[in-house]
Amino acid sequence: MRSFHCIDGSVRSLPDIFGDRQVPPEAGDCCAPKLLDEAFRRKLLPVSFDQFFHGSSDARRHKEFLPPCEQYCRPLMAAMLTLDILYVDSSIIVVNKEPGLLSVPGRGEEKQDCVVSRVKRLFPSCIEQPSVHRLDRDTSGLLVLAFTQEAHRELSIQFIKRTVSKRYVALLEGKVEGEGGTVELAFRYDPEMKPRQKYDPVLGKWGTTMWKRLCVQSYGGQRRTVTRVSFTPLTGRTHQLRLHSAHEKGLGHPIVGDPLYGTGEPAPRLMLHASELSFTHPVTRERMTFALEPDF
């Protein structure tokens, strides 16, 4: 079975990369994994790379950007690059952050591995600080980062003006009553229970979240009821969705697997995923929307 060289110097086989999933017969046959495999084998780093369709077709436009195919390329390239890249051009990159990975580096040697460090290792010519927004370490999902100062400035303005649209999907403990609504709570950092936030209507900053119940389901083959919900945050406070879910003045149902605000019931991860991200491209001014449903 074929193996592939990865950016971190490791060599991984297809069964190792796909894990308990069946390895598709065509996996590794596309041009991008082959080119990256050869580059990493020679200890070369790509400066930039894109895939475009050349020619005419009823299904494709000439010079249309082609993201990695879902079935064959994406799992393979995510392992090779240590980043799940959904889109990249000369100005921006959109990635699917895995749970447990920091968005930006923290204090200490053990907190240097993060999305930013992996992007900078893969694209050495990008700016020193490419991040324009963050996800909690335990949250998975979509992040956009900037390669240039111009792109960083333009995207930052969009986040400040709240013209960026974000949607999350989560599993909440128990059965959430109602079809949807809006949660508005004020909260602040709790110095006595780091890194938790605490409800404080006097000194806290207000956060607003729109939510919609998607379905009620069982979880993990157990007699455990959970509710799948969609969140649209209108503000971007630290731990906003986690606290709005768990607090009795919010939904009163913590996110499954939340080590800070949860019930302690077993779960392999925090069941919170940034599933949709929409913004205006900082150079082309085209409105771009990326969607990726969670694996839970």
For each feature predicted by the language model, list its residue ranges.
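RNA pseudouridine synthases
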Residues: 1-296
